[in-house]
Amino acid sequence: MRRALLSGLLALLTAAAPAHASQLVTWTTTSRYVDPAQLDFNGPPRPKALRVNVLLPDGYTPSRRWPVLYLLHGHGDAYDSWADPKNGDVARVARGFPGVVVMPEGARGWYVNWWRGGRRAGPAWERYHLDELIPLVERRLPILRARRWHAIAGLSMGGEGALFYASQRPGYFGSAASFSGAISIQRPEWPSGFDTQGERHDDVFGDPDAQRFYWTGHNPTVLAANLRWTRLYVTVGDGVAKPSEAENVFGQAAELDLHQHAEDFTAAAREAGADVTYVPRDGIHDWPYWREHLAAAVRWGFFAPARESPSDWTYETVAAKGDAWGWRFEFQRRAPDEVITFSRHGGMLRGDGSGRVAIKPPHGRLFVVKLPFARRL
């Protein structure tokens, strides 16, 4: 009898215990494109290293494949800000989230390859995150392959990064979200305001007149057509702090400005035919509201069905190399000095702009062509 009671109690305890609680792990990565020794990291003194926080979900096991969310931080933050209980508190806010959450370092880099007088380097964040980090994640973790299972989101500067990266890898990311994002970066007040934050606009995006093409090629609002087949979630505050939260003059002013960014982007994305969920809310530019934004986006659902391989798309870029819906391209001799447009409509592939480019189709042999071109598939 006693043995039977002990066995029954053990069975109850086993049934009540979770399979595995979520687990936060930190990776240190290397890069050919970003030198951590040259960076000014945000937050307390920390080693000069490119670190990534990875939140493994409840019940994680490497024997099955998982969805993935890339979660980007803002201008004054670091790779550990989303996981910090005082800031993003992601483990609590997204408790029960059904996928892996990858939170990389972005310093104050704006998630772009810095113009730097035309070198497009020093640092090249886009190359690090898209060409090095994503492949590293997929080598180390069993990630589901279809684009519906790949999402990206971010706050403020990270909102710009999330929508920009989604625009440059539309065949990879099925969903993208911006929380108080800087997502309409060619508004008249932008360059002068940008220069007050510590970086020079000319270094990051180029001179607003002489390198307007480079600036344009990183503006999510202008690139909205790239996101036609991407599920989009955009949320922003109204610049008014809730009575229960502390007031913050900078946070109020910043959110008022970024509210217009959200309006600009949402209008452009809807005009392009994208599926946009736009949620203007109460609040200012501060962590209590971003936690709410993330929780609401989780309820919206990062991994709902998304079109896998549309035969009708437009892709604009200033990148020297990239991937447009599985059509990998690399410009020969020199990088573009204008916004390049690739498009597919049924059985016809087109390229508009100038330059010589090598293109590798998803299925087929590499070919080299001079722009502009039209090629029947």
Q: Model-predicted segments: where are they?
A:
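Family-specific functional microsites
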Residues: 18
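Non-catalytic cap/lid and distal C-terminal segments of serine-dependent acyl enzymes
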Residues: 21-358, 365-370, 374-377
